[in-house]
UniProtKB/Swiss-Prot annotation:
Keywords: Coiled coil. Disulfide bonds: none annotated. Pfam families: DGCR6 (PF07324). It comes from the Eukaryota. InterPro entries: Gonadal (IPR010849). Residues 78-142 form a coiled coil. It comes from Mus musculus (Mouse). Expressed in all the examined tissues with highest expression in testis. Signal peptide: none annotated. Belongs to the gonadal family. May have a role in early embryogenesis. This is Protein DGCR6.
């Protein structure tokens, strides 16, 4: 008798899973209509169905939320690093301007052209160094963000999310961003439905 009850429970679970899959797939198909037509064409029924299957247990929603939080923290940290560098450069410029002004005020008039030429060279050298430091910082930021994207792609691929794999192809990246946006919108909808049920 217990075997029959267990079989009935399994059948009911499968039916609930199938219903949930259908709801997710239907919601995804509805959301896809909001995307540009070029991306709508690339999101086949199979891709959307596979995505809906990956979303069934809610784990992918949690993974995406975690990745989003990590990304925001990373972006904030990188922004703060660049801001610190800009502030250091601002202080360097102010200090050099002050030093030059004091030197000019204490300089004899006949030596002023020589001093100003030397100061101009010093200023140009400092500006060159500042540009190089800013470019190095920008390259570091781009590399860090690229690394973060690859980590996200790898994590979502390992989680079995359709359409995700490590790539640098701009079209594929845009498609993956659209898929993430679909997942995020679905998550927001389910949160709103959950709140409405309360």
């Amino acid at each position: 008798m217990d075997r029959y009850a267990a079989a009935g429970d399994e059948a009911a679970d499968r039916a609930r899973q199938q219903e949930r899959h259908y709801q997710l797939l239907s919601a995804l198909q509805s959301l896809v209509k909001e995307l540009p037509s070029s991306f709508q064409q690339r999101l086949s029924y199979t891709t959307l169905s596979d995505l809906a299957l990956a979303l069934l247990d809610g784990t992918v929603f949690e993974i995406v939320q975690g990745l989003l939080e990590i990304q925001h923290l990373t972006e904030k940290s990188l922004y703060n690093q660049r801001l610190r560098l800009q502030n250091e450069h601002r202080v360097l410029r102010q200090t050099l301007r002050q030093k030059h002004l004091e030197a000019q005020q204490s300089c004899r008039p006949h030596n002023l052209p020589v001093l100003q030429a030397a100061q101009q060279r010093e200023l140009e050298a400092m500006e060159h160094r500042i540009r190089e430091e800013q470019q190095a910082m920008d390259r570091k930021i781009v590399l860090e963000l690229d690394r973060k994207v690859a980590d996200q792609q790898s994590t979502l691929e390992k989680a079995g999310v359709a359409g995700f794999y490590v790539t640098t192809n701009p079209q594929e990246l845009t498609l993956q961003m659209n898929l993430l946006e679909l997942i995020r919108k679905l998550q927001q909808r389910s949160c709103q439905v959950g709140k409405a049920a309360l």
